[in-house]
C-alpha cells in the first residue's frame, strides 16, 4: 500500500519541478483554444505570447502579450492604458491594444515575424524598460518555428 503512495508522490514532485522553466528558454503549451509561448528572464520577468483560435464577436482573433513583472504585477497588451513595446534588432514594435484594423494587424504581424527570428529582445511598458530576454537564435527558431496561427488575425472556418 505504501508503494503506490511513493509513486504518486514522486510523480507529483516531478511534475512540479518541470512546471518552472529555465530563464531565457522558450516553452509553449496549448489549452482552451490558446497557444502560449512563454519565456522568463533571470530577474523573474515573464513574457507570455498568447495566440488564440477563439474569435471575438466580429470574428477577430485577439492575440495578446501578457507580462508578469518581478513584483507579481501583470500587464496585458490588450489594456488601452498600457503601452507595451518590444525592441528587437534595433527596431521597435509597439503592440496594438486590439486587432481587427489595418494598422494594428500590420503592426502585430511585423512583431510576430521579428520575434520568430530574435536571439534577444527588450520589453518596455509605458517607455520604461521592464525586461531583457536572451533565448538565443537556436532556441527561438526551434520553439517558435511555426507562429502561423499568431499571424492570422481574422477567423475563418
What kind of region is each of these model predictions?
Residues 2-9:
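Sec-dependent signal peptide recognition
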Residues 12:
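Basic, ligand-binding patches in group-transfer machinery
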Residues 15-18:
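N-terminal signal peptide c-region/cleavage motif recognized by signal peptidases
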Residues 20-157:
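A generic "folded-domain core" signal
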Amino acid at each position: 500500500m505504501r508503494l503506490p503512495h511513493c509513486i504518486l508522490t514522486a510523480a507529483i514532485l516531478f511534475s512540479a519541478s518541470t512546471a518552472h522553466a529555465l530563464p531565457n528558454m522558450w516553452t509553449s503549451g496549448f489549452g482552451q483554444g490558446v497557444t502560449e509561448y512563454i519565456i522568463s528572464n533571470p530577474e523573474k520577468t515573464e513574457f507570455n505570447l498568447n495566440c488564440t483560435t477563439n474569435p471575438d464577436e466580429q470574428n477577430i482573433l485577439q492575440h495578446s502579450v501578457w507580462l508578469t513583472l518581478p513584483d507579481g504585477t501583470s500587464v496585458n497588451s490588450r489594456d488601452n492604458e498600457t503601452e507595451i513595446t518590444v525592441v528587437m534588432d534595433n527596431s521597435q514594435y509597439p503592440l496594438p491594444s486590439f486587432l481587427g484594423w489595418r494598422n494594428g494587424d500590420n503592426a502585430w504581424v511585423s512583431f510576430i515575424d521579428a520575434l520568430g527570428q530574435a536571439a534577444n529582445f527588450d520589453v518596455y511598458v509605458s517607455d520604461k524598460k521592464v525586461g531583457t530576454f536572451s533565448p538565443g537564435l537556436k532556441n527561438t527558431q526551434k520553439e517558435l518555428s511555426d507562429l502561423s496561427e499568431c499571424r492570422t488575425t481574422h477567423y475563418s472556418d
